[in-house]
Amino acid sequence: MKKIIVAAISLFTLATLNGQVEQQSLPGAEEISNRRSSFNLEEIKVRWKKAALENCTGVPCTTGPGGGSFTCGTSTVADIDGNTYNTVLIGTQCWTKSNLKVTKYNDGTAIPLDASGGTNGNGAGETWSARYTSSTAAYSILSNEPSNGTNATNYGFLYNWYAVTNPKKICPAGWHVPTDAEFAALVSYSTNPGNKLKSTSALWNPSVPGAGTDNFGFSALPGGERAFSGSYTLTLSGDYAYFWTSSPDITHPTVDSWQYAIHKSDNTTIGRYSTPQESGDSVRCLKD
C-alpha cells in the first residue's frame, strides 16, 4: 500500500489526489509527536473524521462527505446533479427543506423523464404507466416545463413510486425517502400539522388567507400530483401538496403505497392515503 511521509506537525494532514499533502487546522486532532511518521491514506481519513466529530457541536452532529461536519438546519446537502438543499431539524428528524429535483440515481443512471403530458398513460412515447400495466420508473415536471422552469424551481419534480424505491437510490447518499412510520412521526410531532408544516407562500390558493404558518421550516408547497393515467390533477391550483413514502400498502403491496397530503384549507390534519404506485408525487429526503 502506498505510504505518505508526513513531517513533524501538531495537527493532521490530508492527502490530495495528486499525492501532495495539504496541512489542515483540526483542533482536537491527536498530536503526532514523533519526528517522522508514515501513514497510509485510510489512516489519515479515519483520524480526520475522528477530529471532525469531536469538534462538532451541532445537534445532530455527524461527519459529512470527506470527513467534514454536518449540522442539520445549518448545513446543506447536494444531490448527484449538484442541486443543493437546505435542511431543517424537526424533533429528532433532519429533513430536506425543499422538494427533490434530481434526474439521476446515485450511481449516475438517468431516471426516465416523461414529458408527454398525455391523459392516457398508454399513449405513444409515454413512460408513465397506467395502473396495473407496468412498473416503469419515471419523473415528470409540472406542465411539462423544462427542468429550469418556474414550476421546477418552485415545486421540484414529481416521481412515481418505482423511481422513489429503486435500489439505486434517489436521495443523496446518507439520506432516504421516509417510511410511512417516519412521515407519521413528522405529522404527530405537534398539533395542527396541516398549518404548521405548510409554507406561508402565496403559491397556496389565495382563497384561504394565511393558509400556512410554517412553524418548523418544513415549508410544504402545493406541487400537486400526476395521476397514474398520466394526466396532471390538482396541479397549479394551489390546493394540495403530496409526498411519497417508501412504504407499500400491505393490503395490496404491488400496486398501492402510502402518501401524505396537505390541503390548502385543512390546518388541523394531514391526509394519509393508499395511492397507485404509478402516481407522481413530490419527494422529501430524510437523513439516515
Predicted feature descriptions by range:
Residues 1-4, 17, 33, 39, ...:
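Generic cytosolic/nucleocytoplasmic N-terminal low-complexity/intrinsically disordered segments
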Residues 3-11:
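Small-residue packing motifs within transmembrane alpha-helices
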Residues 4-5, 20-70, 77, 284-288:
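Enriched but not universal
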Residues 10-18:
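Hydrophobic h-region of N-terminal signal peptides that target proteins for export
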Residues 56-288:
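Conserved positions within compact, well-structured domain cores
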